[in-house]
Amino acid sequence: MDFLTLAGQLNAGVILPEGIVIVTLLTVLVTDLILGRQSLRLTPALAITGLSAAIAVLTLQWNTSQNLAFLGGFNGDNLSIVFRGIVLLSAAVTILLSIRYVEQSGTSLGEFITILLTASLGGMFLSGANELVTIFVSLETLSISSYLLTGYMKRDPRSNEAALKYLLIGAASSAIFLYGVSLLYGLAGGETQLPAIAEKLGEAQPLALLISLIFVIAGIAFKISAVPFHQWTPDVYEGSPTPIVAFLSVGSKAAGFALAIRLLVTAYPALTEQWHFVFTALAILSLVLGNVVALAQTSMKRLLAYSSIAQAGFVMIGLIAGTEAGYSSMVYYLLIYLFMNLGGFACVILFSLRTGTDQISEYAGLYQKDPLVTLGLSLCLLSLGGIPPLAGFFGKLYLFWAGWQAGLYGLVLLALITSVISIYYYIRVIKMMVVKEPQEMSESVRNYPETNWNLPGMQPLRAGLVVCVIATAVAGILSNPLFNLASASVSGSSFLGLAPAAEVVTTTATPVALSEPPAAS
């Protein structure tokens, strides 16, 4: 094999965005080592520039015909491009939200950004991994970096406790997932690439394959915080640095769903009915427990933790539907969830920087002292609850419509009921912020310091908040382009083998389903 043939089979240009992130990571690390504390303003700019360049390259790779790299070990199709874009965007916004937070804590910003970029790199590779070894290495890169970020505030006992819990439970989850993958490898006769595994699995014993599926789903469910594999989520979210919680709730979760789609659809075609059943149970448990337990929370971060568990239940509806409309609505919801969830955490960060607390009761009367945070948090929470015309309403509408067309009537009705429950605890926070009587104002708000936007890191934090809030508001009204993007990413991914139950035609307001399926070709 000559060099040109090898280069053609490797097709390394597919992972050019990941290469840019690696170069950015090394540049940030070296800059921080050379300049030390003087690199405070330079390292975030370098990181965001590199992430922006990687996103630009991803857009140029859209609809390319040669999307397999490294002898089929990585798939750079349109679906992976969207998921990798979500990971990159969540990392970029997280950096904007982190600068002031990390600076005020007295820890190194350069090291923080380096670990965050490493986690992003793991999430990107996981979103396109098409081979078992690549999947596991990518998953561990993301996981280990997440453990380090969770315990990054070394002087905070809560951060140390959260990191230890996350590490212990995460290590057990990785071991379970690895055991399932090793069974899959053995049953496939030593094949590691997912398409080749699917071809060989017809000869496997059903019971052994089912055991493998159960272990693999357990590992994936941990990554997406699905009940009953959610125990780490509330404690880790409460004790971790708030910007890291924001990244874990969006970037890490998106990578987990990308893994779920690619691994389960490609490697377990014979057990589609079985894994749909398991995910239906996970979705029901996540919707009920996430929304019901959130009603009793007094900490804003714990409330958002249980909210993220419930949001995973909503996203699973699209996965269970298994149609083009289902996968498209799933991708669309993750796109808008990026902005509305990060926007909510940006408001929590701003409030905690000024008051040192995240207790919901301390938000009482906030609109009188900080209208920006009140407006931003209100819009993001209303969007998470699915109030029109915000982005979250259309995201849930598309998911429920796809689920209904796929015959998931009970699951969709349950999701509607739990969505109404979620509106209650979101509005409870908003009501707390807009109390009018001075005597109802909390002690933290009474002593609320005047905002000084000239402090280092405050302008990026405000920029991140404004971008997320505007995107949350506008993405609902202009939902067509985003949904078309999600639909194109799904229809262009051949491994899904879609036979849609109904074609979805979008308008600026609501999706319309054709009553008859498309004619067979």
UniProtKB/Swiss-Prot annotation:
EC number: 7.1.1.-
Domain of life: Bacteria
UniProt catalytic activity: a plastoquinone + NADH + (n+1) H(+)(in) = a plastoquinol + NAD(+) + n H(+)(out); a plastoquinone + NADPH + (n+1) H(+)(in) = a plastoquinol + NADP(+) + n H(+)(out)
GO biological process, one term: ATP synthesis coupled electron transport
Record text on subunit structure and interactions: NDH-1 can be composed of about 15 different subunits; different subcomplexes with different compositions have been identified which probably have different functions.
UniProt-recorded name of the protein: NAD(P)H-quinone oxidoreductase subunit 2
Membrane topology: Multi-pass membrane protein
Annotated Gene Ontology cellular component terms: plasma membrane-derived thylakoid membrane
Record's keyword annotation contains NADP: yes
EC primary class: translocase
Reported function: NDH-1 shuttles electrons from an unknown electron donor, via FMN and iron-sulfur (Fe-S) centers, to quinones in the respiratory and/or the photosynthetic chain. The immediate electron acceptor for the enzyme in this species is believed to be plastoquinone. Couples the redox reaction to proton translocation, and thus conserves the redox energy in a proton gradient. Cyanobacterial NDH-1 also plays a role in inorganic carbon-concentration.
Similarity comment: family membership: Belongs to the complex I subunit 2 family.
Location in or out of the cell: Cellular thylakoid membrane
Residue spans crossing the bilayer: 14-34, 42-62, 79-99, 109-129, 132-152, 167-187, 207-227, 241-261, 275-295, 303-323, 331-351, 375-395, 397-417, 463-483
Keyword set, alphabetical order: Membrane, NAD, NADP, Plastoquinone, Quinone, Thylakoid, Translocase, Transmembrane, Transmembrane helix, Transport
PANTHER family in alphabetical order: NADH DEHYDROGENASE
Taxonomic source organism: Synechococcus elongatus (strain ATCC 33912 / PCC 7942 / FACHB-805)
Gene Ontology MF terms in the entry: NADH dehydrogenase (ubiquinone) activity; quinone binding
